[in-house]
Amino acid sequence: DFVIFTGDLTHTTDDPKERRKRMTEFRDIAAQLKVKTVRFIPGEHDASLDNGKAFKEFFGAPNYTFDHKGVHFIVLDNVSDPGAQLGEVQLAWLADDLKKQAQDARIVVFAHRPLFDLYPQWDWATRDGAKAIELLMPHTNVTVFYGHIHQEHHQMTGHIAHHSAKSLIFPLPVAGSQPKRSPLPWDPA
């Protein structure tokens, strides 16, 4: 029905012209997918250097909601702010949206960084993510998907399930398994 990319659509560059070139290339590649709808979330490589300006030009609002087949989807932007946070404005927006949802509504949240403190030393957290989780807690059927860590991970915060999947490229080590976060060597197997 749809595909959603959970961020890091491009690799970081300080050159605004190069950033736009890379986003154009990614948008053109994604447009070739044989699916009706493609949705995007910014990753820090797409948004942190210009507070999400180029991302918005190419892909639209970095946070939004949509409903599909009885599920309410919420897309959060926890990368455009260089402080790795959602911010008070977005948290108020989330609170307003959640007020419209029944307590037992099926809710799926997408974000780039994990909303909980997975490993803050490697920037694997959202500084005010606990506030978002607190807003989600009254709802009994919530699942969160995130990118950023480039590996499969599953975590529960109360009754809220959080999941990430492996990246197709740029594999990262398990949190804390080495002193510095750096890509793992390529394994041709």
List the predicted regions and their residue ranges:
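Residue-level marker for buried hydrophobic side chains located in beta-strands
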Residues: 3-5, 40, 109, 145
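Active-site glycine-centered loops adjacent to acidic/histidine catalytic or metal-binding residues
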Residues: 7-8, 43-44, 112, 147-148
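Extended active-site neighborhood of metal-dependent phosphoesterases/phosphodiesterases
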Residues: 15-106, 128-143, 155-188
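Short, catalytically relevant binding-site loops at active-site mouths
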Residues: 80-81, 113-117, 149-152
